[in-house]
């Protein structure tokens, strides 16, 4: 993975990070254990539904959805169609998270990234044609809204196809690849690179979180589903 100047990113793993990775490996992967008599699989669907709803609402609220949690939960549980922009963001996120469960065994491709973005942003963008389409200009910047300061100018839009192809290859590597990258770090870097490249006019945060979820699930971190 490289920055917009072609320089390779460097990864540092200080001791606190290694400890955190150990805890995640211990508690979020492997066999499901429970101290209760009732097998966890009997409650799995209920827990999973609740988790998907919570993730969909929280992720959308981070992006500005103003729908209340109570209204959003009712919409998803009742299966009714969204009535406004905020509800549409939550509905799209929920539908995409459901789809990701079946896609975790699939390799990541630029086409899949575009499709995930399309699903997440359908009917929520100022220009509906931008859903599932790479940005075509360089007027997208990361800005401090308090002062209007440009914090980050993403790579040139003409570089995005190649950068997504490179990112997909990185995402598909496994524990036998060289150099070894811990699966959790790989998922974090996927999230980071979408934010760094900002390949879309909007919805980059939602897409980054979806790819993080996909990567963690693909690597066997079952707790991420809950």
Language model regions located:
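FIC/Doc superfamily catalytic core
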Residues: 1-226
């Amino acid at each position: 993975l490289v920055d917009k100047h072609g320089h390779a990113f460097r990864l540092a793993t200080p001791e606190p990070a290694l400890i955190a990775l150990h805890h995640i490996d211990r508690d979020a992967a492997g066999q499901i254990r429970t101290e209760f008599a009732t097998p966890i699989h009997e409650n799995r669907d209920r827990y999973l539904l609740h988790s998907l709803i919570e993730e969909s609402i929280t992720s959308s609220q981070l992006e500005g959805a103003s729908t209340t949690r109570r209204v959003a939960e009712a919409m998803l549980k009742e299966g009714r169609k969204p009535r406004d922009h905020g509800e549409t963001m939550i509905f799209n996120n929920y539908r995409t998270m459901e789809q990701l469960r079946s896609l975790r065994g699939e390799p990541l491709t630029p086409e899949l990234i575009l499709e995930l973005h399309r699903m997440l942003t359908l009917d929520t963008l100022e220009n509906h044609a931008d859903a599932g389409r790479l940005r075509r200009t360089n007027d997208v910047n990361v800005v401090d809204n308090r002062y209007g300061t440009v914090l980050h100018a993403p790579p040139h839009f003409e570089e995005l196809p190649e950068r997504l192809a490179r990112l997909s290859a990185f995402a598909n590597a496994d524990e036998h690849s060289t150099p070894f990258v811990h699966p959790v770090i790989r998922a974090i870097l996927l999230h980071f690179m979408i934010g760094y490249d900002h390949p879309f006019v909007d919805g980059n945060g939602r897409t980054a979180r979806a790819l993080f979820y996909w990567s963690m699930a693909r690597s066997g971190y079952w707790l991420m589903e809950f």
